[in-house]
A protein has these predicted regions:
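Asp-based, Mg2+/Mn2+-dependent phosphohydrolase catalytic module
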Residues: 2-32, 38-177
């Protein structure tokens, strides 16, 4: 029952993902959430994120931002790098994930979804038949508002951590200098 909310992998952050390993496993594209996955909610991109997307592009990995944000927010976020995107996506509906796969021009088994929320990013990926990586939520900790969903996520993550499906990806450090 809870497994529809479980990611295939769980890591600290987007910089802990071994992208070379993903490529060696046959993945050709990544679908990223923005807020609280790549940067705190509403924040502009950082040099580290810009460098990550440049590295992924240099590796030949296709990328797409899948966000429930509007176009202006996404355009502002990605002003320093090129990537495809879908705005006002309607996550967790599987249709937006299918559209993303089409835009990336890859097969569903060649895509990995990266996000911070079980109830949108991971649920949507699972419903669309895509694999996923859950990253820990990035937030402004002093202003952090913990809603019911975040508290439910903690409970589900406890069950995930005690399930046979629980996997952590081997990590690498992306040089941020």
């Amino acid at each position: 029952m809870c497994s529809i909310f479980y990611p295939n992998y769980y890591v600290e952050d987007v910089f802990s993902i071994d992208y070379e390993k993903l490529m060696s496993m046959g993945y050709k594209a990544l679908i990223f959430d923005i807020d609280n996955t790549l940067v705190p909610h509403g924040a502009d991109s950082t040099n580290a994120v810009d460098e990550l997307f440049a590295k992924l592009n240099d590796m030949g990995m296709k990328t797409l931002l899948l966000s429930n944000n509007n176009q202006a927010r996404i355009e502002r976020f990605k002003k320093s790098f090129h990537t495809l995107y879908i705005e006002e996506a309607g996550k967790p509906h599987p249709q937006c994930y299918h559209m993303a796969v089409e835009m990336l021009e890859v097969k569903p088994n060649e895509v990995m979804v990266v996000g911070d929320q079980l109830f949108t990013d991971i649920l949507g990926a699972n419903r669309a038949g895509l694999e996923s990586i859950l990253v820990k939520y990035i937030g402004y900790y002093k202003k952090e508002k913990k809603g019911i969903r975040r508290n439910l996520e903690k409970v589900l993550l406890w069950f995930y951590g005690h399930s046979s499906r629980s996997k952590r990806m081997p990590s690498i450090t992306i040089d941020n200098s």
